[in-house]
């Protein structure tokens, strides 16, 4: 018998491998944070000698979901500003509070965001915020995978006086996390309309120099397009194209107000689009033309955006809403079938992370997985596992979250931090935010 770190048993394993196999009454062997083998349980128990055994015999095991665009720390703003247009929401509520932030608020807000993700089946995220050093430290503490980086604005933030300092912070973070098994860094210009061509060029140059991906908001609303036309005489995608900003690996959040020609360009560049359906619905920003993206072969992922504009960080919510919205707006019930949406939340997310170890459970891939209880009322009876994951599951069926072979959440308990203490800290943060927003 071969030794392994952990042997995980499940009623079903949705592998998301190239054949999209679903294994019944199966087991997965994990060694050094990597999937060593998968197969029928009765065979695996005769082949592998584990140090630990995790029996989720009535559960469905699937690859951990990837939240491909979020601002994890913004849990501290959840419910602060609802039912407002994007620009009013940003300029009247969000940006003023963010100018008063402290590193500790960002650390705690991020940790709460990661707790929500781990609880609901997300194992990795692409994050962007201020004081991102604290967000990355929180991700390390929680055990999550994270592609993060300091957001770059043309104006001062609470963290830095200007874009030059934010880019230097990006450089420092890239050096700090080089070679880290779970954490990596991207260059994060906020958007075309909150930066300048010179700042975007500096972001491009740093990404090229350090071989980092680029992550930004792009073409989120028609209003953004008008702002860019007024300031630069070009639409947002054209601004990026003229600067060769998207010539390297890039993850683009929203991509709503785009033309067919712009989609052709983005597809040719291999850009990854992130569909943030809940946030776009709540802010009435519009919907990404996802079917048109997929027709062009564009990688498409799903993201929650921040809790201030969603208000959840739950990828099961995003899957269900994405599948339903496009059927409605396209007046076609065959658009975005369940398997396509699950692919977006897993394999598309891996593309957004620029990490081919993620997105599926196969030999040699990262042992990042979650276990959903099939005995939950909303999961009964079971005809089609993928259908249930997209249309029936809520994320609250999750019993276990494993990242790099380590169980970081199981049956209501987080293994790496004190959740009750975190809740007490969030109450203090709420009182601070109320005062800053003039709501106390």
Swiss-Prot record:
From the UniProt record, which GO molecular function terms apply? 5'-methylthioadenosine deaminase activity; metal ion binding; S-adenosylhomocysteine deaminase activity
Organism's domain of life?
A: Bacteria
What this protein catalyses is: S-adenosyl-L-homocysteine + H2O + H(+) = S-inosyl-L-homocysteine + NH4(+); S-methyl-5'-thioadenosine + H2O + H(+) = S-methyl-5'-thioinosine + NH4(+)
Q: Which residues bind Zn(2+)?
A: 69, 71, 217, 305
User: Kind of enzyme, top EC level?
Assistant: hydrolase
The record lists substrate as bound by 98, 190, 220, 305
> Required co-factor?
Zn(2+)
Spell out the SUPFAM superfamilies in the cross-references. Composite domain of metallo-dependent hydrolases, Metallo-dependent hydrolases
PANTHER family referenced in this protein's UniProt entry, alphabetically: AMIDOHYDROLASE-RELATED DOMAIN-CONTAINING PROTEIN, AMINOHYDROLASE SSNA-RELATED
Q: What is its EC number?
A: 3.5.4.28, 3.5.4.31
Protein family per UniProt: Belongs to the metallo-dependent hydrolases superfamily. MTA/SAH deaminase family.
What this chain does, per the entry, is described as: Catalyzes the deamination of 5-methylthioadenosine and S-adenosyl-L-homocysteine into 5-methylthioinosine and S-inosyl-L-homocysteine, respectively. Is also able to deaminate adenosine.
InterPro entries in the record:
Amidohydro-rel, Deaminase_MtaD/DadD, Metal-dep_hydrolase_composite, Metal_Hydrolase, MTA/SAH_deaminase
The protein's name: 5-methylthioadenosine/S-adenosylhomocysteine deaminase
Co-factor: note: Binds 1 zinc ion per subunit.
Task: Provide the alphabetized UniProt keywords.
Answer: Hydrolase, Metal-binding, Zinc
């Amino acid at each position: 018998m071969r030794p392994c770190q952990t042997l995980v048993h499940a009623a079903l394993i949705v592998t998301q491998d190239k054949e999209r196999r679903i294994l019944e009454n199966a087991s997965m062997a994990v060694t050094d944070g990597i999937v060593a083998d998968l197969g029928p349980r009765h065979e695996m128990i005769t082949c592998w000698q584990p140090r630990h055994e995790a029996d989720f015999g009535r559960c469905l095991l699937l690859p951990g979901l990837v939240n491909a665009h979020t601002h994890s720390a913004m849990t501290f703003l959840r419910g602060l500003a609802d039912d407002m247009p994007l620009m009013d929401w940003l300029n009247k509520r969000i940006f003023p509070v963010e100018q008063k932030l402290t590193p500790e608020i960002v650390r705690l807000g991020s940790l709460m965001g990661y707790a929500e993700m781990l609880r609901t089946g997300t194992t990795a995220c692409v994050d962007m915020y201020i004081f991102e050093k604290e967000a990355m430290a929180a991700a390390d503490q929680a055990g999550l995978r994270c592609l993060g980086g300091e957001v770059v604005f043309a104006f001062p933030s609470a963290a830095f006086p200007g874009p030059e300092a934010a880019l230097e912070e990006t450089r420092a973070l890239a050096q700090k996390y080089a070679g880290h098994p779970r954490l990596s860094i991207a260059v994060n210009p906020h958007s075309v309309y909150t930066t300048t061509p010179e700042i975007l060029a500096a972001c491009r140059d740093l990404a090229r120099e350090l071989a980092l991906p680029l992550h930004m908001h792009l073409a989120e609303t028609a209003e953004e397009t008008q702002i860019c036309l007024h300031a630069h005489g070009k639409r947002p995608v054209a601004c990026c194209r003229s600067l060769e900003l998207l010539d390297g690996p890039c993850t683009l959040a929203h991509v709503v107000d785009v033309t067919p020609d712009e989609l052709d360009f983005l597809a040719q560049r291999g850009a990854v689009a992130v569909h943030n359906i809940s946030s776009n619905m709540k802010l009435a920003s519009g919907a990404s033309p996802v079917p048109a993206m997929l027709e062009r072969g564009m990688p498409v992922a799903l993201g929650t955006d921040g809790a201030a504009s969603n208000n959840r960080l739950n990828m099961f919510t995003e899957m269900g809403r994405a599948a339903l919205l496009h059927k409605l707006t396209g007046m076609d019930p065959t658009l975005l079938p369940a398997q396509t949406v699950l692919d977006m939340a897993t394999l598309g997310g891996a593309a957004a992370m620029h990490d081919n170890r993620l997105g599926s459970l196969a030999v040699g891939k990262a042992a990042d997985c979650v276990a959903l209880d099939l005995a939950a009322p909303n999961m009964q009876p079971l005809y089609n596992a993928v259908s249930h994951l997209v249309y029936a599951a809520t994320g609250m069926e999750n019993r276990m979250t494993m990242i790099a072979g380590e169980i970081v959440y199981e049956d209501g308990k987080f293994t790496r931090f004190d959740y009750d203490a975190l809740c007490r800290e969030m109450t203090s943060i709420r009182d601070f935010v109320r005062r800053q927003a003039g709501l106390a």
